[in-house]
Amino acid sequence: MTQAKESNFISAVVYLRNDAARVAPFLAAVCAQLEEHFAQYELIAVDDCSTDGTAQAVRDFAAQNLTKPLTLLHMSLAQGVELCMNAGQDCAIGDFVYEFDAADLCYDPALIWKAYETALLGNDVVSVGDRKSVV
């Protein structure tokens, strides 16, 4: 029996800086988790003035793989993680917002779902890191 997908709208904001080589596998892993568990979601990729073709790699991935919306923000000057994530949050419309501060899943992608379950328990902020724990 297939489990019903969650109806909450999810926004996933990812910071990118010269990540052309790894952005496609990263987005594929995140999208696989979101697609498995959520009926509706959006991706927001914030390109922090990359010089290696990161923005084009995101566009190529979206054209070939996505059925859900993707917003690509391109910073004309390098802003750093915090300001870029704030810009991505400003665009997010989700009931829940995931923030990825690098295009690198250094933990089991299943923790994306576990973080959501933990948030539903009433936690305003849930953090996942490379120790494979949800706090």
Residue ranges and their predicted role:
Residues 97:
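Short aromatic/hydrophobic "clamp" motif used to bind/position activated sugar donors
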Residues 79, 103-106:
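Acidic metal-phosphate-binding loop of nucleotide-sugar-dependent transferases
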Residues 75-92, 110-114:
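Glycine-rich, basic loop-to-helix element that forms the pyrophosphate-binding segment
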Residues 22-24, 52-61:
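Acidic helix N-cap motif at the loop->helix transition within catalytic regions
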Residues 39-49, 73-74:
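Short beta-strand/loop segment that forms part of the nucleotide-sugar
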